């Protein structure tokens, strides 16, 4: 049996627009894009604390490369376990910009943000333990970027370059 969600994305966007009118944009009735990433932490706090939203579960954070736009994005997937609704928020930044960490609001953001930095180079301000999580500290670059050149060797060991399944 499929349960009807208590709040749909249009309702969620109206709540966000009432406080952050110039900072969010509804895209194709599927996700909300935060256009003013400087307001992200305040928006995230509202998502968690607003009685009509109550997003208590950060399911995952994914990062992506915008390609020719020279932007890098983060997609946050939230769930309200008590109100049974879901939301995806996306934020895009350039290489010189950073996003506020939300690890103080959702502990699960800690490692997800570190992975987004390690693989895609997205920086998170005020992260309590901002360092690489998968690659060595001296690894050069961020391997999931479309413009990344895989090195021939790392510390004298050959680095495999078989991209058959993902290029």
Where are these regions (language model features)?
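Terminal low-complexity/charged segments
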Residues: 1-167
